[in-house]
Structures are given as structure tokens and as C-alpha cells.
Swiss-Prot record:
Keyword vocabulary terms for this entry: ATP-binding, Ligase, Nucleotide-binding, Protein biosynthesis
PANTHER family recorded: GLUTAMYL-TRNA GLN AMIDOTRANSFERASE SUBUNIT B MITOCHONDRIAL AND PROKARYOTIC PET112-RELATED, GLUTAMYL-TRNA(GLN) AMIDOTRANSFERASE SUBUNIT B, MITOCHONDRIAL
Gene name, Swiss-Prot/TrEMBL: gatB
UniProt EC number: 6.3.5.-
Assembly mode: Heterotrimer of A, B and C subunits.
Free-text function comment from the UniProt entry: Allows the formation of correctly charged Asn-tRNA(Asn) or Gln-tRNA(Gln) through the transamidation of misacylated Asp-tRNA(Asn) or Glu-tRNA(Gln) in organisms which lack either or both of asparaginyl-tRNA or glutaminyl-tRNA synthetases. The reaction takes place in the presence of glutamine and ATP through an activated phospho-Asp-tRNA(Asn) or phospho-Glu-tRNA(Gln).
Reaction it catalyzes: L-glutamyl-tRNA(Gln) + L-glutamine + ATP + H2O = L-glutaminyl-tRNA(Gln) + L-glutamate + ADP + phosphate + H(+); L-aspartyl-tRNA(Asn) + L-glutamine + ATP + H2O = L-asparaginyl-tRNA(Asn) + L-glutamate + ADP + phosphate + 2 H(+)
A Pfam family matched in the record: GatB_Yqey
Organism whose genome encodes this protein: Enterococcus faecalis (strain ATCC 700802 / V583)
Protein name as annotated: Aspartyl/glutamyl-tRNA(Asn/Gln) amidotransferase subunit B
Source organism superkingdom: Bacteria
GO function terms (MF aspect): asparaginyl-tRNA synthase (glutamine-hydrolyzing) activity; ATP binding; glutaminyl-tRNA synthase (glutamine-hydrolyzing) activity
Matching InterPro entries: Asn/Gln-tRNA_amidoTrfase_suB/E (IPR017959), Asn/Gln-tRNA_Trfase_suB/E_cat (IPR006075), Asn/Gln_amidotransferase (IPR018027), Asn/Gln_tRNA_amidoTrase-B-like (IPR003789), GatB (IPR004413), GatB_C_1 (IPR042114), GatB_Yqey_C_2 (IPR023168), Gln-tRNA_amidoTrfase_suB_CS (IPR017958)
């Protein structure tokens, strides 16, 4: 029997506000444990939460970017559960009236585009963090407690781990462009839980789902879902039943392990939060937030294709992250050709970032310097081969491209008066290659060009070398 995979994702995104959602404590990553807290975060008796308007508007902004409808009337609820990192024994969240609902985003997998529906976007506060020490004690850090979150809940529209990965890529890109979050999974500002079930092809009713946690990267999401897909199929084919449960992804083995039997919403005993008033959102407020939205990735992609003439693949890669897209735009603003800038960013720049595991902002490369280097290639000052040496210097140490070329003596040799003596010396030492050329063996020219480039340490202009070489060969 063949099964259809059904996947839905719940993505938590930390909002990049200066303070927390219900307290005035800072909401910054990386501080000393329990240094970004106050009495609200510690849940002292008698203290009351105060809604952060900026967090609310960030939530609206994200929901609008995800094509959601904004709820005109909304409120917060208490989600009751006990855990050491949750001093109130409840979380302030939204249950039946989320800030946004009925949205969608478009993904593309293997050339096929598909809309993934978004059920809801709701606001909530984050919990603290438990730290289990090697001394046998567990510690609680409440810096994260009260950090504003949005939870983005998709419909179960994805049918493969690859579609789930594409959805996360598209979602991360959209949220990055809104600038409400930096969506860094490695820092915990974007976290994903996945729900997966199988059903026989043709069956409308969903199968019993498992929820996957500890998915700390997009690759782990894909690996966890791929394993769970196989595990559930094996259980069903052997006549067993899938249990509704929560499972943890094990990074070492790329498998999923049972954590607990899955709770339902009734286990959390939701009820309206009495300490945070209900609030209304009118059309004027919605349109004000909508007007603050920047150009979204899909719009930029379309512009790159229609106005700049870039291939669809280039446009897609350049808009995967706001950082790369903004860098590309700034490089063009400094006079670079669009296709050349795209090639460098997708090629040498991306390769360097991947190998060094850094982001563009961590390097010394600037749009001005990249554009300057491209100009030097186009005016013949340096060759593409020399440009790679210049690029390495620019991205590691910075500086002006022209100054780097001059300081390191990398200017391309194009003067016939300089090149002809070297060309003739190579010809004098390679009579066999001359004979091969005269006998119609074209590869002899390639060999001779290689020898000339070697003699000039790669600094000769290949076009000029070819022209002069052909002229000299005709004389012999």
C-alpha cells in the first residue's frame, strides 16, 4: 500500500523589539543569565502585565506580509502548564482570536509552484530556559521569559519533507524582509515543530499525527520528517497503529525518539487572560501598518527578472535572504552590471560564506568594493582570474579594489610591447607546438597560451595574448 504524507508546521518567531511583550525588561539575545529580567518576568505577587504596542504592530506586520486577514477584535488567553522555566505556571498566548488568520505563501519545489495556507498567526510570550549543568543541578535562565513571539501555524498542506523545507525557506525570507525578526534558528529566534501523518492515497481523512520537536535547523526539519515518514509507513505496513505522541529529533542518529503522549488543547485549560484587556484594531491602524511593509521577496524576484533580465534561478537565490538582496541592490547602485554582480554573489561570495560559516555582515566586503572590482574587470585592468585574488583580499581585509590591485601589482598586462617578448620566448622554446599548430592541432594554441600565462604569473590579458599569439604564429 502506498501512503500520502501530510505535514503541517508550527513556527515560533521571536520579535525584534527592544523590550518584552508584557514588561519593560530588555529583549536582547546573549546577555548574562537572568540579567534581562524584572518583577513581571519573575511573576512577583501583585505585578501586572502591560502590553507592548510595538510587539503588537510587529505581529500585525508579519501577518500582513503572510497575506493574512487581521482580526478586528482580539484578546489574550492563559495557557496553563507547569514547568520550571515558567514561573507563573501559565503562558499568556492567543487561543480563539489570533491577531492574523487565513493567510498563505507560495513555495516552489522541482519547478512546481504551490500555495501553502496559513491557518493563523498569534502573539504570545516566550518561556525561560532550563540549563542542565554537569554538576548535577539544573538552572533556570529567565532572560527569554516574556520575549514577544508570533506562532505561525500552517494548514496541513505539505506533502513531503522537501515541501516543508521550501516552506521554511520562503517563510524565513518573508519575515526577514519585514525586519520584525532576524529569524536565526541557531540563536533560537526561529523555532519549528512539525506535525506529520500518513494516509492511503485517495483518503480524505487525516491519519494520526506525531509532533516532532528539537528541530534546530531547516536541515534537521527535513531529516526528521524523512525519518518519521519511513517510521510511520513501516508501522502501518506491519499492521500497527500510529499513536498520537510528541517525538524528539536526535541529531546524532537522525532519528526520532518518543518524548511523551501528545496533549490536546483541553490539557492546557485555556481561558481569557483577565490582566490584559481586549483590544480592537480598526482599518486605519491596519492600513498604517500595511504601508510600512517593505518590498517583499516575491516582488523583488519579479523585478529582478523583468527589469534586470536576471534568470529566474538567480532572482530566487538572491532573495532568499534580505542581507544578500540588499547587498545586491547596493552593488548595482554603485554601478555594477546586474548579471555580473549576481554571478559574484551566487558564486565566490556564497562559497566563501559557506566555507567560513559566516554572514556577509561578518566580512570586510562592501557593495562599493565589489562594484569597483567588477568595473576593473570590465575595463581590462584585471582578468577574471586575477579578480579572484582581489576578491579574497577584499572580503578578508577590506580596502578599495583599485588600491589593492595597484599595491599588489596585479594590473593585467595588455600592452603588446610588454607581451611580445614573452610570447616569442615561449614560441622559441616550443617548436613542437608550432609544428602541431601548422598541422591543424588546435590544442597546441591552448598549450602555448597556458605557457604565456604561466610566464606572466596569470596577469596577461587572455584576449590580447590570443590575438598576438595568432599573429606571431602566422610569421613562423
Amino acid at each position: 500500500m502506498n501512503f500520502e504524507t501530510v505535514i503541517g508546521l508550527e513556527v515560533h518567531v521571536e520579535l525584534k523589539t527592544n523590550s518584552k511583550i508584557f514588561s519593560s525588561a530588555p529583549a536582547h539575545f546573549g546577555a548574562e543569565p537572568n540579567s534581562n529580567t524584572n518583577v513581571v518576568d519573575w511573576s512577583y505577587p501583585g505585578v501586572l502585565p502591560v502590553m507592548n504596542k510595538g510587539a503588537l504592530e510587529f505581529g500585525m506586520k508579519a501577518a500582513l506580509a503572510l497575506n493574512c486577514e487581521i482580526s478586528k477584535e482580539t484578546h489574550f488567553d492563559r495557557k496553563n502548564y507547569f514547568y520550571p522555566d515558567n514561573p507563573k505556571a501559565y503562558q499568556i498566548s492567543q487561543f480563539d482570536q489570533p491577531i492574523g488568520h487565513d493567510g498563505w505563501i507560495e513555495i516552489e519545489v522541482e519547478g512546481k509552484k504551490k500555495k501553502i495556507r496559513i491557518e493563523r498567526v498569534h502573539l504570545e510570550e516566550d518561556a525561560g530556559k532550563n540549563i542542565h549543568g554537569t554538576d548535577g543541578y539544573s538552572y533556570v535562565d529567565l532572560n527569554r521569559q516574556g520575549t514577544p513571539l508570533i506562532e505561525i501555524v500552517s494548514e496541513a498542506d505539505m506533502r513531503s519533507p522537501e515541501e516543508a523545507y521550501a516552506y521554511l525557506e520562503a517563510l524565513r525570507s518573508i519575515i526577514q524582509f519585514t525586519e520584525v525578526s532576524d529569524v536565526k534558528m541557531e540563536e533560537g529566534s526561529m523555532r519549528c515543530d512539525a506535525n506529520i501523518s500518513l494516509r492511503p492515497y485517495g483518503q480524505e481523512e487525516f491519519g494520526t499525527k506525531a509532533e516532532l520537536k528539537n528541530l534546530n535547523s531547516m536541515n534537521f526539519v527535513k531529516k526528521g520528517l524523512a525519518y518519521e515518514e519511513k517510521r510511520q509507513a513501516k508501522v502501518l505496513l506491519s499492521g500497527g497503529e500510529i499513536q498520537q505522541e510528541t517525538r524528539r529529533f536526535d541529531e546524532a542518529t537522525s532519528t526520532t525518539l518518543l518524548m511523551r503522549v501528545k496533549e490536546g488543547s483541553s490539557d492546557y485549560r485555556y481561558f481569557p487572560e483577565p490582566d490584559v484587556p481586549r483590544f480592537s484594531i480598526d482599518d486605519e491602524w491596519i492600513e498604517k501598518v500595511r504601508a510600512s511593509l517593505p518590498e517583499m521577496p516575491a516582488s523583488r524576484r519579479a523585478r529582478y527578472i523583468s527589469e534586470l533580465g536576471l534568470p529566474e534561478y538567480d532572482a530566487m537565490v538572491l532573495t532568499l535572504t534580505k542581507e544578500m538582496s540588499d547587498f545586491f541592490e547596493a552593488t548595482l547602485a554603485n554601478g555594477a552590471d546586474a548579471k555580473q554582480a549576481s554571478n559574484w554573489l551566487m558564486g565566490e561570495v556564497s562559497a566563501y560564506l559557506n566555507s567560513e560559516k559566516v554572514e556577509l555582515a561578518d566580512t570586510k566586503l562592501t557593495p562599493e568594493n565589489l562594484a569597483g572590482m567588477i568595473t576593473l574587470i570590465n575595463d581590462g585592468t584585471i582578468s577574471s582570474k586575477i579578480a579572484k585574488k582581489v576578491f579574497k583580499e577584499l572580503i578578508e581585509n577590506g580596502g578599495d579594489a583599485k588600491e589593492v590591485v595597484e599595491a599588489k601589482g596585479l594590473v593585467q598586462l595588455s600592452d603588446p610591447a610588454q607581451l611580445l617578448p614573452m610570447i616569442n620566448e615561449v614560441l622559441d622554446n616550443n617548436q613542437q607546438s608550432i609544428d602541431d599548430f601548422k598541422n591543424g592541432k588546435d590544442r597546441a594554441v591552448g598549450f602555448l597560451v597556458g605557457q604565456i600565462m604561466k610566464a606572466t604569473r596569470g596577469q596577461a590579458n587572455p584576449g590580447v595574448v590570443n590575438k598576438l599569439l595568432q599573429e606571431e604564429l602566422s610569421k613562423r
